[in-house]
């Protein structure tokens, strides 16, 4: 699972429940920004403050319960947005959270 270039544009399409009214989208200039957005959605839904460390297993459970999440990543070669699976984003979120936990 190779990451996109650091400056890749990403559009996140998220549907939190089966009701289409729960659909949201967000637009990001990097993979890190997209992951930080997902972490922010988790913190908002779980009433976790930014200063608290994130329980990674609870984050994964929350992420698994999201009805649908599609990251569209801009590919300069094709000059198009390429859809990725929810697990692709989860993999990169895991790397991000693991690295964040190692920072004192």
UniProtKB/Swiss-Prot annotation:
Q: How does it assemble?
A: Homodimer. Component of the erh1-mmi1 complex. Interacts with mmi1 (via N-terminus) in a 2:2 stoichiometry.
Question: Per the UniProt entry, what species is this protein from, by scientific name?
Answer: Schizosaccharomyces pombe (strain 972 / ATCC 24843) (Fission yeast)
GO MF term set: molecular function inhibitor activity
Q: Name one GO biological process term.
A: nuclear mRNA surveillance of meiosis-specific transcripts
Similarity remark: Belongs to the E(R) family.
**Protein's UniProt keywords contain Cytoplasm:** yes
Consequences of knocking out this gene? Abnormal poly(A)-site selection of ssm4. Decreases degradation of mRNA containing a DSR (determinant of selective removal) region. Increases levels of mating and meiosis specific transcripts. Increases expression of ncRNAs responsive to environmental and developmental signals. Decreases expression of antisense RNAs, intergenic RNAs, tRNAs and 5S rRNA. Decreases heterochromatin formation at meiotic heterochromatin islands. Decreases heterochromatin formation at rDNA. Decreases mating efficiency. Decreases vegetative cell population growth. Sensitive to cold. Sensitive to sorbitol.
Q: Which SUPFAM superfamilies match?
A: ERH-like
Q: Which Gene3D superfamilies match?
A: Enhancer of rudimentary
What keywords are annotated for this sequence in UniProt? Answer: Cytoplasm, Nucleus
Name of the protein: Enhancer of rudimentary homolog 1
UniProt key word Cytoplasm: yes
Compartment list: Nucleus; Cytoplasm
| Record-linked InterPro entries | EHR_sf (IPR035912), ERH (IPR000781)
User: What does the protein in this record do?
Assistant: Forms part of the erh1-mmi1 complex that recruits the CCR4-NOT complex and the NURS complex to target RNAs. Suppresses the meiotic program during vegetative growth and promotes the meiotic program during mating. Recruitment of the NURS complex to target mRNAs promotes mRNA decay by engagement of the nuclear exosome, and formation of heterochromatin islands at meiotic genes silenced by the exosome.
């Amino acid at each position: 699972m190779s990451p996109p270039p650091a400056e890749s544009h990403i559009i996140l399409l998220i549907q939190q429940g089966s009701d289409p009214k729960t659909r949201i989208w967000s637009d990001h200039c990097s993979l890190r920004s997209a992951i930080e957005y997902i972490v922010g959605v988790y913190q908002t839904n779980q009433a976790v403050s930014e200063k608290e460390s994130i329980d990674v297993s609870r984050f994964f459970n929350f992420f698994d319960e999201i009805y649908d999440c599609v990251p569209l990543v801009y590919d300069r070669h094709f000059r198009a947005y390429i859809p990725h699976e929810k697990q692709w984003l989860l993999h990169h979120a895991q790397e991000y959270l693991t690295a964040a936990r190692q920072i004192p």
